[in-house]
């Protein structure tokens, strides 16, 4: 628990007011309170009514929320209560609520929670309000709101104390509401296509399913080291072996790697697997997910993002990795070449060759990352990744140097990774062993051998198309946000 700091004057006054409430027989931390309306329901129902129409209707309502503004003196006061949907004004008169209730109002501080019952009305200025008949104290805020309660400007505080950001910054609040809606719509889309949502282990004996550095922990009772999952892939494909045919999982994965504007150590992915499908079917599925979210959540195909217009409508561009490199960098990897020839090309083009690079495929990937990625602004499926960097993908039938894999790039960043899954257990074991060798040579993103998964494949897995989407980046795109910390309620902080 954080150390309790010395109370400042405001905090002392608030504690005194809490004591005064106790002395008056009022619980400063109240109990259940039943509302008839939230602020949005009131505005939607009555904003178009005139002051006279509302007076004639003589409607009453019960609202509750956090006190955000308060003004007035003498026997009349105005205030604004804030709930999840917005704000509603309060009009409080001493002769309407009585002395005891008016004292509650007068002594309430900004940040306190109140319940209010009263008449739905409009002021002379035309603002929809609740004319209070009864006030109920619901919770005392012992700390004041941030000084600029209309919006925190200190980003460090916004991330560390997200609750203050949500109270004071409606744009931030709405962004997280949008995130929830996006996730709900992805679920709706997948469920509607016959996929089963499943849950797989977060703790694993071996971290697999991706090239990434895992977090390790120790299970005391079993006395074994375990890894937090870096992907959900291998367990989901075991379910395809088991006959579930169409599965998906939305969940957290963990990678012990660097942090930047688009990377956080724990993040959310959606992975799906479909028996009897291939990577081209999964391209269609991926397009469908993005377009469904565009239609149902933001209501448009053209998104303003990072100073650019991104169009997620229609068919996404599809290009082979080798063709993309040839187009941008002018280097042609279609002709067969030796590793030495590829290394020479790399040096000519200022590409560093790592010690664990053992094939032309590694160098092709480096060319792509250095020269092509940042040029892919509009949604683009890049397919045909080299076998060496795709240990779980099926080899291409026509050219076994490459795999039936794609990545979706938007604005120079990867948004999805998918492939026709490798279902040959002998080939899979060989690729796992090659990864283990790369790990020994210093590639800390390479994985070890998952013998249990190989055994599952030996029981037979049908041809399968698999997909992984980074949910946080997807939310960034659809909310126009350039930092991943702005779409994570509680980002990792030092």
From Swiss-Prot:
Under the heading Pfam families, the entry gives: tRNA-synt_2, tRNA_anti-codon
Cofactor(s) needed by this chain = Mg(2+)
Catalysed reactions, semicolon-separated: tRNA(Lys) + L-lysine + ATP = L-lysyl-tRNA(Lys) + AMP + diphosphate
Where, per UniProt, does this protein localize? Cytoplasm
Q: Does the keyword Metal-binding apply?
A: yes
Return the InterPro entries for the record: Aa-tRNA-synt_II, aa-tRNA-synth_II, aa-tRNA-synth_II/BPL/LPL, Lys-tRNA-ligase_II, Lys-tRNA-ligase_II_N, Lys-tRNA-synth_II_C, NA-bd_OB-fold, NA-bd_OB_tRNA
Q: Which GO terms describe its biological process?
A: lysyl-tRNA aminoacylation
- The first-level EC class reads ligase
Instruction: Provide this UniProt record's keywords sorted from A to Z.
Output: Aminoacyl-tRNA synthetase, ATP-binding, Cytoplasm, Ligase, Magnesium, Metal-binding, Nucleotide-binding, Protein biosynthesis
Entry cofactor note text?
A: Binds 3 Mg(2+) ions per subunit.
Provide GO CC annotations from the record. Answer: cytosol
Q: EC number(s) of the enzyme?
A: 6.1.1.6
Gene3D superfamilies xref list = Bira Bifunctional Protein, Domain 2, Nucleic acid-binding proteins
Q: Where does Mg(2+) 2 bind?
A: 414
List ligand-binding residues for Mg(2+) 1.
407, 414
Query: Per UniProt, what is one GO molecular function of this protein?
Result: catalytic activity, acting on a protein
* Oligomeric and partner information: Homodimer.
User: Its family?
Assistant: Belongs to the class-II aminoacyl-tRNA synthetase family.
| Name of the protein in question | Lysine--tRNA ligase
